[in-house]
Amino acid sequence: MTTALYLPEENIDMIAATSVLQQQAADIRTRTINWASYMQSQMISEEDYKAISALDKSRASFLAQNSSQVVKTLLNLVSHLSKDSTIQYILVLLDDLLQEDRSRVDLFHDTAGKLKQCIWGPFLNLLNRQDGFIVNMSSRILAKFACWGHETMPKSDLNFYLQFLKDQLASNNNEYIQSVARCLQMMLRVDEYRFAFVGVDGISTLIRILSTRVNFQVQYQLIFCLWVLTFNPLLAAKMNKFSVIPILADILSDCAKEKVTRIILAVFRNLIEKPEDSSVAKDHCIAMVQCKVLKQLSILEQRRFDDEDITADVEYLSEKLQNSVQDLSSFDEYATEVRSGRLEWSPVHKSAKFWRENAQRLNEKNYELLRILVHLLETSKDAIILSVACFDIGEYVRHYPRGKHVLEQLGGKQIVMQHLGHEDPNVRYEALLAVQKLMVHNWEYLGKQLEKENENQKQGAAPIAGKA
């Protein structure tokens, strides 16, 4: 049995009148198919001919009296006919039947079971067709079969289908992207399907698309997908590992559409409310503060919204984030900034007291923060991020005696040195300082050695070389 999350119907309507799929479906409904010619050429049986002809003439009454035959006929036609225009017509007819009455999904499941036919196979096969309408209408029907009935999609088929949806979302200039997103919105309302989507690296795909410029409708649909994922406490706890908060904070700051604002606030609220570990909720609050969400909330507080949910969420988030700021230690602030990947010259970086007290904490959780700094040095193109990362690594080595050894083990020393030739002068400068710190084991030891050297020179003794 599928366990679908209850959501207001206005949020999950299946008919988007402006979508390409619906516009084409409206044209296809007006077609007349010559079923007699199919029977005469023995491409369909007489039984199927009578059923589909009767269904064309009086859908509701014939279906009510001959439901099993209708299901059998439609599955036969989808499986055995190949002409694009005919398949398009059958798919629209079938989709309309399901849209008119959701209980018909179970009718299809039950009848297919009695006939020992696989209900998934014919439609999964159609996903490989060249015709975009056939592919996406088949996908839409699969989503309804998977979400509206008592049977869930088998695991192997599920992984194939979710991978298909993910690939379609990521496809450049896909005119059916709203329809693809609509199917995913449906699928992720079922808890059993959420982990499977994460398993095909689906969240990363959503975030990657949201980080590009997409129209507000697709933006809303994809954030909706993130929202329904956050209703699962385990997924809500893991969500910001994918940088969900920074991406949504950016969208919120530029957002002009109320529906997009509403769904982002709902995601943020779930990221605080749903995780069972309070420390995770705290981390999410800190991440939101780091991403300047409080500033956006203060702007939203000045606006009037007809939607009471927005007002309630703004009040809730403002209170939670204000409380987290009061409890925020300098290391919490630093760790959140590093995890966000958005390094800037915030005060903690230049604080000698901070590094004296906290350098060793970069070793926590198997050197998590240090690994992130090295990764940013390796992957970021932003000069400020690179400069700050070089500086932080230098301070870590300076204040933690074994820092040089640890950094070498992580491959960080070589990466820092590569930036000595960076095109940006600030990056070159910070990389040079970091390398100088890397060449010395212990700054206090070096200072003492220099004092001894000066003393010996005064006494005429040979100088003592500092360790490099």
Curated annotation (Swiss-Prot):
Family: Belongs to the V-ATPase H subunit family.
Protein's organism: Drosophila melanogaster (Fruit fly)
S-S bonds: none
The entry's keywords: Hydrogen ion transport, Ion transport, Transport
Annotated function: Subunit of the V1 complex of vacuolar(H+)-ATPase (V-ATPase), a multisubunit enzyme composed of a peripheral complex (V1) that hydrolyzes ATP and a membrane integral complex (V0) that translocates protons. V-ATPase is responsible for acidifying and maintaining the pH of intracellular compartments and in some cell types, is targeted to the plasma membrane, where it is responsible for acidifying the extracellular environment. Subunit H is essential for V-ATPase activity, but not for the assembly of the complex.
Protein's name in the database: V-type proton ATPase subunit H
Quaternary structure and partners: V-ATPase is a heteromultimeric enzyme made up of two complexes: the ATP-hydrolytic V1 complex and the proton translocation V0 complex. The V1 complex consists of three catalytic AB heterodimers that form a heterohexamer, three peripheral stalks each consisting of EG heterodimers, one central rotor including subunits D and F, and the regulatory subunits C and H. The proton translocation complex V0 consists of the proton transport subunit a, a ring of proteolipid subunits c9c'', rotary subunit d, subunits e and f, and the accessory subunits VhaAC45 and ATP6AP2.
Gene Ontology biological process: determination of adult lifespan; lysosomal lumen acidification; proton transmembrane transport
Single annotated GO MF: proton-transporting ATPase activity, rotational mechanism
InterPro entries xref list: ARM-like, ARM-type_fold, ATPase_V1-cplx_hsu, ATPase_V1-cplx_hsu_C, ATPase_V1-cplx_hsu_C_sf
Alphabetized CDD domains for the sequence: VATPase_H (cd00256)
Keyword Transferase: no
Keyword set includes Ion transport: yes
Pfam families registered for this protein in UniProt: V-ATPase_H_C (PF11698), V-ATPase_H_N (PF03224)
Cellular compartments per GO CC: plasma membrane proton-transporting V-type ATPase complex; vacuolar proton-transporting V-type ATPase, V1 domain
